[in-house]
Amino acid sequence: MKTDDFDFSLPNELIAQLPLANRADSRMLYINSRQSDLRDAAFKDLPAYLKQGDVIVFNNTRVVKARLAGFKSTGGKVEVMIERILGTHQARALIRASHAPAIGSTLLLENAITVQVEAREQDIYTLRFIHSQPLIELLDQYGHTPLPPYIGRIATASDESRYQTVFAQETGAVAAPTAGLHFDETMLTTLQTLGIKIAWVTLHVGAGTFQPVRVENINQHIMHTEQYHIPTETIEIIRRCKAGGGSVLAVGTTSLRALEASALIGDGELVAGSNETNLFITPGFQFRVVDRLLTNFHLPRSTLLMLVSAFAGIETIRHAYQHAVNNHYRFFSYGDAMLIEGDSRS
């Protein structure tokens, strides 16, 4: 299958640059893949599509302030985007500079942090932070909110809260699980009042989520790896839901990938505990856990667009995205949502 099959034209003005004043005011495009049903709705309508006994699974990862600016020892400017935290003083990162820093060289970030460049693998550097404070504390003190590259502005103080879900708990992501950004406390309370069960997973979203697929044949793409955790309680909630005839709604592609990666390891059964995954979901994938998906609109030629095409069907997603463009939906991280009733057909 070709990467070109997942390309589409998107006017720049449809890329949301700012969040809405209220989280839950987004629009929502409802897609029933099995019935070829496409419906314009509001995110606040979500409870009407669920029933008592259904489960909604959230990713409770917390975004760290992963962007740092500074200088090379030669004086050239650098911008560092943490891709993954490896330990107390070590991380993998993307580095933007006029000339790539040499292995063994040092960087001075935010006029406070000395960093040694230890290794490089393609575009990813391994960095060691030479400081008495743990890396997590340094990022919280000196870092900046890692807004995606398609948001063409500098992060503001409001982004610290708005580019974070209201239920964020487990620190480690360098990008937000954006489908979760639509939920406010009122919506969470409403869902629970209606008897909708809430379950949690953790998947620490890496910067690789924004990378386009650069190969012509999607089967040649090398997927980035992310860490995830599935609690035993979540598995029990999902088992009871399935046994009672309920459906499982994954909030975001990250929640879906964590669940489906776990089920793949367990030969159809969810496996509790922590692991990492480079699962690349493309059309033809057999979904074992998730029945419904709430997700934002994704970038052309991206692995996430391929994932939703696998979940809903390629032609269904093409039609839905064209409808969204024609009707001026807002795209990407701060944009609107889609609620998809799954279809394993490719």
From Swiss-Prot:
Q: Does the keyword Cytoplasm apply?
A: yes
What terms describe the molecular function in GO for this protein?
A: S-adenosylmethionine:tRNA ribosyltransferase-isomerase activity
List the cysteine pairs that form cystine: none
Superkingdom in the source lineage = Bacteria
Q: What are the GO cellular component annotations?
A: cytoplasm
Q: Which EC number(s) does the record attach to this protein?
A: 2.4.99.17
Enzyme class name: transferase
GO BP, one example? queuosine biosynthetic process
Matching InterPro entries, A to Z? QueA, QueA_dom1, QueA_dom2, QueA_sf
Q: Which UniProt keywords apply?
A: Cytoplasm, Queuosine biosynthesis, S-adenosyl-L-methionine, Transferase
Q: Which Pfam families match?
A: Queuosine_synth (PF02547)
Q: In which pathway does it act?
A: tRNA modification; tRNA-queuosine biosynthesis
Name the NCBIfam families on file.
PRK00147.1, queA
Q: Which family does it belong to?
A: Belongs to the QueA family.
How does it associate, per the subunit comment?
Monomer.
What does this chain do?
Answer: Transfers and isomerizes the ribose moiety from AdoMet to the 7-aminomethyl group of 7-deazaguanine (preQ1-tRNA) to give epoxyqueuosine (oQ-tRNA).
Q: What is this protein called?
A: S-adenosylmethionine:tRNA ribosyltransferase-isomerase
Q: Which organism is it from?
A: Nitrosomonas eutropha (strain DSM 101675 / C91 / Nm57)
Q: What is the lineage of its organism?
A: Bacteria, Pseudomonadati, Pseudomonadota, Betaproteobacteria, Nitrosomonadales
